[in-house]
């Protein structure tokens, strides 16, 4: 069964909002983050996934997107804050998103220059 999503991206808490619909939420958010999504998201640096809703049909997801776009900005902010009051980026918690690797430096971490060998 195919799944569809309506989603809201933000540039920052209570910042610029973008509403979209997709059948591949992870891929689409990654496109937006890489500046390959839409011209709008690229121009306004809208990259935080702050809200999403899952649907079984494309028609239902598109209807929801159209409805959300008609609502006022205040209504949209209220929608986001009811489920995500701190405007946390939801993308890293999506099932299937690879965790960001923790880089462990190798070698000497001492910033002081090495003493020359006087032998």
Write out the residue ranges for each language-model feature:
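GIY-YIG nuclease catalytic motif and its immediate N-terminal context
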Residues: 1-54, 59-66, 83-85, 89-113, ...
């Amino acid at each position: 069964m195919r799944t569809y999503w309506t989603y809201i991206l933000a540039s920052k808490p209570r910042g610029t909002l973008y509403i979209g619909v997709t059948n591949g939420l992870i891929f689409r958010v990654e496109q937006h983050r890489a500046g390959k999504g839409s011209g709008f998201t690229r121009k306004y640096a809208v990259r935080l996934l702050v809200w999403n809703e899952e649907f079984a049909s494309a028609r239902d997801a598109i209807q929801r997107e159209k409805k959300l776009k008609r609502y006022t900005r205040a209504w949209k902010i209220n929608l986001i804050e009811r489920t995500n009051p701190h405007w946390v980026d939801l993308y890293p918690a999506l099932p299937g998103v690879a965790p960001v690797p923790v880089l462990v430096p190798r070698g000497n971490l001492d910033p002081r220059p090495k003493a020359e060998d006087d032998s």
